[in-house]
């Protein structure tokens, strides 16, 4: 019993000394490990205290268990050995941890001082609790000596187990500490730099994550093209460096070649050689085609010319059309005129035979053209438009009614609403929002080129035996239209002359295809009469030497040639004059009566 009491007293003294000597160092060590190793995700004091308390209580319990099983002097030395080894391992681990967490310690200096000092005070409290528990265990050991003696074979195994636990616990602790350091410690340590690196949705980005993102971005397509661009720039720099090492003679030769290439690119390319004879042959065929198509007075489409005559030579069709127009002017005294730039419609205009109406030629359709002059006069005197009701009101006074066949005009309604409209002499359109539908008549595109407002006004005033100036509004409008038409004609003639000079037309190339026998061509009697009239006009102009005399002679000769071509033409001309003046004479006589009324066309009729 006395031995037991002595051993218990010795054990108590040993525990007291160990607790006095090692408690301060162990607590400081544990405090350092707690601060450096077990750093929480955020600096929360409560979590830090819980971790430190668990670690220290486990340490204290391990020490007390070691003292319970040690009865012999060897067992008494075991706690000291265990404590020393544990202290050494802990110190080593602490040093390793301190070396790894230098950045975390430096970043923590700006943290809240209260959050840093709280673990120390709490650790002191835990140390007192651990001492109290150790003393309590010692008293329990004194009270139960029989149990200690009964378990006598176990001390060595227990001591070995405790030693093994003490040896392995720091390693596991260090491994866990490294994991925590990697996962949470760096994030918490870099909290001060999280604002500089940026946050996403409240989540801090660690240095490791930023490094991995940088490595991943360096392998992306953007980085690939950036590296390729840098290599390209490097290659260009190297090429320039190599070029700079060339001899001055080589550099001068390259400069000359570059200048020659630049000059050749700036100079206009020479046009490929053209087969003028072939082009002129196609132009002559086009002249025949135009003369035949114009007999119907329907405008000729450019698409028809390309399809029927020009065919595979579409790349040079402008020159072929221009050569055909030049031949028409020089041989026939006819101008090829494009009246619609959108639909590309062409007509033939006379340049040798001016008449009072200005309408092309003297043909078998002269009576119809006389009726057309009446319609154009009514439309112009009404303000460039006239309703269908007014037109028929005037024609009824002249004995022309819709649906009744006329000996000269046939179906009058079809003539004025279909044939004249197709020939582009008139436009026939419905009045918007009219119920029942009503229609109006306007001048067509062809009428603006074959005649003029001034000629129509003079024609109407001649019938009425009035001066054109008495119709002030119409006279002013006609004068403005004539000035505008003259300016457009001058500009068009200048542009045509430039185009022909560039194409080499009019320099004798029209004879490249050989003489063309127009008399044998299937161009109709009217075209042949125009050829004869043109030839006679040229001969008379050369003989007289005067432009005015030549113009009057060509007019008389063309009229005589047209009359001698066929008896039907002369009869048609006289019929046109009789019809035209007879119609307006009737209108004038009707206007002389007192019971007559003034119509919308400006003429007086019953």
From Swiss-Prot:
The reply to whether Acyltransferase figures as a keyword in the UniProt entry is: no
What keywords is this UniProt entry annotated with? Acetylation, Phosphoprotein, Tumor antigen
Point to the regions of Basic residues compositional bias.
171-181, 248-260
Signal peptide, first to last residue:
none
Composition bias, kind Low complexity: at what positions? 142-164
Q: Which residues carry this modification: Phosphoserine?
A: 5, 157, 190-191, 194, 197, 244, 247, 264-265
Q: Which residues does the record list as N-acetylserine (modified residue)?
A: 2
Q: SMART domains from the xrefs?
A: MAGE (SM01373)
Indicate the segments forming the MAGE domain, all copies: 279-478
Q: Where is the composition biased (Polar residues)?
A: 79-100
Give the Basic and acidic residues compositional bias ranges. Answer: 122-131
The record describes the protein's role as: Regulates the expression, localization to the plasma membrane and function of the sodium chloride cotransporters SLC12A1 and SLC12A3, two key components of salt reabsorption in the distal renal tubule.
Q: How does it assemble?
A: Interacts with GNAS.
The protein depicted here goes by the name Melanoma-associated antigen D2
* Lineage of the organism: Eukaryota, Metazoa, Chordata, Craniata, Vertebrata
């Amino acid at each position: 019993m006395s031995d037991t009491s002595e051993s218990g007293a010795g054990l108590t003294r040993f525990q007291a000394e160990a607790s006095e000597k090692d408690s301060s160092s162990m607590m400081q060590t544990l405090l350092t490990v707690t601060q450096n190793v077990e750093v929480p995700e955020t600096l929360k004091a409560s979590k830090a205290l819980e971790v430190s308390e668990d670690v220290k209580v486990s340490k204290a319990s391990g020490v007390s268990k070691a003292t319970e099983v040690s009865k012999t002097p060897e067992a008494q030395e075991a706690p000291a050995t265990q404590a020393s080894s544990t202290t050494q391992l802990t110190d080593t681990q602490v040093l390793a941890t301190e070396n790894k967490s230098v950045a975390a310690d430096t970043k923590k200096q700006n943290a809240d001082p209260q959050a840093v000092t709280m673990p120390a005070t709490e650790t002191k409290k835990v140390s007192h609790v651990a001492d109290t528990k150790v003393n309590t265990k010692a008293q329990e050991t004194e009270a139960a000596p029989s149990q200690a003696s009964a378990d006598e074979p176990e001390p060595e195994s227990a001591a070995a187990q405790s030693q093994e636990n003490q040896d392995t616990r720091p390693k596991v602790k260090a491994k866990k500490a490294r994991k925590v350091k990697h996962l949470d410690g760096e994030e918490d340590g870099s909290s001060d730099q999280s604002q500089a690196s940026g946050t996403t949705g409240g989540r801090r980005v660690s240095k490791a994550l930023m490094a991995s993102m940088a490595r991943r971005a360096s392998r992306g397509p953007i980085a690939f093209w950036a590296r390729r661009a840098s290599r390209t720039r490097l290659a260009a720099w190297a090429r320039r460096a190599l070029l700079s090492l060339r001899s001055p003679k080589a550099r001068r030769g390259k400069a000359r070649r570059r200048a020659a290439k630049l000059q050749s690119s700036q100079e206009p390319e020479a046009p490929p050689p053209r087969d003028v004879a072939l082009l002129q042959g196609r132009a002559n065929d086009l002249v025949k085609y135009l003369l035949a198509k114009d007999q119907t007075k329907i405008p000729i489409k450019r698409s028809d010319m390309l399809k029927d005559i020009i065919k595979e030579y579409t790349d040079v069709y402008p020159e072929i059309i221009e050569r055909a127009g030049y031949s028409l002017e020089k041989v026939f005294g006819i101008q090829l005129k494009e009246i619609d730039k959108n639909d590309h419609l062409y007509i033939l205009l006379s340049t040798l035979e001016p008449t009072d109406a200005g309408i092309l030629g003297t043909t078998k359709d002269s009576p119809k053209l006389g009726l057309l002059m009446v319609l154009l006069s009514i439309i112009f005197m009404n303000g460039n438009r006239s309703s269908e009701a007014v037109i028929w009101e005037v024609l009824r006074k002249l004995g022309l009614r819709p649906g009744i066949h006329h000996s000269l005009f046939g179906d009058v309604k079809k003539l004025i609403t279909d044939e004249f409209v197709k020939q582009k002499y008139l436009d026939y359109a419905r009045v918007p929002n009219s119920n029942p539908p009503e229609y109006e008549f306007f001048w067509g595109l062809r009428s603006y080129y074959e005649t003029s407002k001034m000629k129509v006004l003079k024609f109407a005033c001649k019938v009425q035996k009035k001066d054109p100036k008495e119709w002030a509004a119409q006279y002013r409008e006609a004068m403005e239209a004539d000035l505008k038409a003259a300016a457009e004609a001058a500009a068009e003639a200048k542009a045509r002359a430039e185009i022909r000079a560039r194409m080499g037309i009019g320099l004798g190339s029209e004879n490249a295809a050989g003489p063309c026998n127009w008399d044998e061509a299937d161009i109709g009697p009217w075209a042949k009469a125009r050829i004869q009239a043109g030839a006679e006009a040229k001969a008379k102009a050369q003989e007289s030497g005067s432009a005015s005399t030549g113009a009057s002679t060509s007019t008389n000769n063309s009229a005589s040639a047209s009359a001698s071509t066929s008896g039907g033409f002369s009869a048609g001309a006289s019929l046109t004059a009789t019809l035209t003046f007879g119609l307006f004479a009737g209108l004038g006589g009707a206007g002389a009566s007192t019971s007559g009324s003034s119509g919308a066309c400006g003429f007086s009729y019953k």
